[in-house]
Amino acid sequence: MLEAVGIIRETSSLPAVCGRVCPQEKQCESQCIYTLSLKKEAVSIGNLERYVADYERIHRDHSIKSKHSEKPKLGRIAVVGSGPAGLSFATDMAKWGYDVTVYEAESQLGGVLRYGIPEFCLPNSIIEDELDKMRDLGVTFQTDTIVGKTITYEGLKAQGMDGIFIATGVGVANYMGIPGEDLKGVYTASEYLAKY
């Protein structure tokens, strides 16, 4: 089973997340050869990914550090935003041998994973476990840091960053310009998901 974990992690940076919340039935399974050519039920890749990731989470030896952290670093990379794009990019860069720091404006990491997906769909413990795996790769995190205000892009370059990946994720909501949209108790979808 641990071999399956290694195979999945070659191409999926967040398998415990993707196995729970990605629409595999549209993205992967609808294009499965079993469905398209053989007219059979698709391989349930999302369920397999989740099962293998959960097995890893339960049976993982946290005392063993990744071999990747022993490699000499190729350079320093700043990642702005800790949502799925930022975390996936940071994981890949760390695997390839870069020293990666993720900067997050919020007090907790995860971006839309934490603030936009209800916890009954994606428990915070799953997010934390994926973050721990990233820490094992040598990725560091700075929360409560607004790049452009708390620290400037020039400041990042002055700290020796060789590259900056901007993964700021969910933007400002579009309002419809109708009466009452600014009243107390009226929320955008993002505000509602973050609040409740």
What residue spans do the PLM features occupy?
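Ferredoxin-type iron-sulfur electron-transfer modules in oxidoreductases and energy-metabolism complexes
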Residues: 1-20, 38-71, 196
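N-terminal Rossmann-like dinucleotide/flavin-binding domain of flavoprotein oxidoreductases
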Residues: 5-15, 48, 113-161
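Short cysteine clusters
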Residues: 18, 22, 28, 32
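Glycine-rich dinucleotide-binding loop and its adjacent helix/turn
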Residues: 52-70, 129-149, 173-196
